[in-house]
UniProtKB/Swiss-Prot annotation:
This is Cytochrome b6-f complex subunit 6. Belongs to the PetL family. Its main location: plastid. It comes from Panax ginseng (Korean ginseng). It is found in: Plastid, Chloroplast thylakoid membrane. GO terms for cellular component: chloroplast thylakoid membrane; cytochrome b6f complex. It is a single-pass membrane protein. PANTHER family: CYTOCHROME B6-F COMPLEX SUBUNIT 6. GO terms for molecular function: electron transporter, transferring electrons within cytochrome b6/f complex of photosystem II activity. InterPro entries: Cyt_b6/f_cplx_su6 (IPR007802). The 4 large subunits of the cytochrome b6-f complex are cytochrome b6, subunit IV (17 kDa polypeptide, PetD), cytochrome f and the Rieske protein, while the 4 small subunits are PetG, PetL, PetM and PetN. The complex functions as a dimer.
C-alpha cells in the first residue's frame, strides 16, 4: 500500500507543477 500512496503523491505533485508552469506561461503570453 505505501508504494501506491507514494506513487499517487508523486503524480499529484507532478500534475501541480505542470499546471503551475502552464498557468505561468499563459500569464506571460497574456502580458
Amino acid at each position: 500500500m505505501p508504494t501506491i500512496t507514494s506513487y499517487f503523491g508523486f503524480l499529484l505533485v507532478a500534475l501541480t507543477i505542470t499546471s503551475a508552469l502552464f498557468i505561468g506561461l499563459s500569464k506571460i503570453r497574456l502580458i
